């Protein structure tokens, strides 16, 4: 329970950082990793069972690759690092299992809890494009191309000067649009006029759905996957 509370505090701090500046300080995820290794090492010591510390180390390694895969898909590097932190901190948690995935999730060395947190966070994020679209419609944004129609669900249109102040990432203009921006490459606004309107990333970080998922996954487990499978008759 202590490690769950530490994880909740870490994700809350990360969410605040990400909402304010879209940058997550490294000390957040590093602290989660260090505490996780020490805490699980302590559990192994007092129980004379190496399973806890092994699960923590394996959880960190598996979640490193999961975080890297998320980064390749365009998710911020800070989000992936937080998943690494969860892998070391709380690789396993007594969550309810509602689907046949239970046999896989219950595998001894699989960091099932962080993986389930990411999966549920993806489901929670499904509603975000609808919110972004409605916000654009209310603002009177009118798409001119097929890609701009997609951007209505994925980004916001604003003046370059405003985007710079809000530290957004560039999606582009109607002539050249990129739907998956890179935090390293798509932050140079010098090629645009400051009064020009362009498409940029919305101010809805993925850390927030991760934080929400973290709190709820301990209660619902893989229930959302169960609902999804039942809808499609699987």
UniProtKB/Swiss-Prot annotation:
Biological process per Gene Ontology, one example term: proteolysis
A Pfam family it matches: Peptidase_A24
EC code: 3.4.23.52
Membrane topology: Multi-pass membrane protein
Enzyme kind, highest EC tier: hydrolase
Extracellular side: 19-23, 73-78, 140-205
GO MF annotations, alphabetized: aspartic-type endopeptidase activity
GO CC annotations, alphabetized: plasma membrane
Catalytic activity annotation: Cleaves the signal peptide of 3 to 12 amino acids from the N-terminal of preflagellin, usually at Arg-Gly-|- or Lys-Gly-|-, to release flagellin
Cytoplasmic side: 1, 47-49, 90-110, 218-234
Annotated site residues (Essential for catalysis) in this chain: 18, 79
Keyword annotations from UniProtKB, A to Z: Archaeal flagellum biogenesis, Cell membrane, Hydrolase, Membrane, Protease, Transmembrane, Transmembrane helix
Transmembrane segments: 2-18, 24-46, 50-72, 79-89, 111-139, 206-217
Location(s) in or outside the cell: Cell membrane
Task of the protein: Cleaves the N-terminal leader peptide from preflagellins.
Similarity comment: Belongs to the peptidase A24 family. Archaeal preflagellin peptidase subfamily.
NCBIfam families: FlaK_Arch (NF040695)
Annotated PANTHER family: PREFLAGELLIN PEPTIDASE
Protein name as annotated: Preflagellin peptidase
